[in-house]
Swiss-Prot record:
Transmembrane feature ranges: none
Source species, domain of life: Bacteria
GO molecular function: DNA binding; DNA-binding transcription factor activity
Annotated Gene3D superfamilies: Winged helix-like DNA-binding domain superfamily/Winged helix DNA-binding domain
Keyword field contains DNA-binding: yes
Organism listed in the record: Bacillus subtilis (strain 168)
PROSITE patterns: HTH_ARSR_2
Name listed for the protein in its UniProt record: Uncharacterized HTH-type transcriptional regulator YuzN
Segments forming a coiled coil: none
Domain HTH arsR-type residues, every copy: 1-92
One GO biological process term: regulation of DNA-templated transcription
Length: 92
């Protein structure tokens, strides 16, 4: 579990990754293109889809983001279970 905790904290340690999670928690099941457009327009970020894909890889390694095929698109899904499990140990 410690390795997973480290991965979660690493993932949350970057402001862009936190914005990605904010967007996915607000509107789950976004494509990479939709997520990129939302980040650029809402937060005035200067970021490419390739850079977002790298951030998503870190979030996926931490278990915070998963993806699934929906038709011809791959949609991104926020998974808050790792955060709940992490906090459960400290709060309970």
């Amino acid at each position: 579990m410690n390795g997973n905790k480290d991965a979660i904290f690493k993932a949350l340690g970057d402001s862009t990754r936190r914005l990605i999670l904010d967007e996915l928690s607000e509107r789950n099941e976004l494509t990479l293109y939709e997520l990129t457009i939302r980040l650029i327009t809402k937060y005035d970020l200067s970021i490419t889809r390739q850079a977002i894909a790298k951030h998503l890889s870190v979030l996926e390694d931490a278990g915070l983001v998963t993806s699934k095929r929906k038709g011809k698109y791959r949609v991104l899904i926020f998974n808050n279970e790792p955060l709940k499990n992490l906090l459960k140990g400290w709060i309970e």
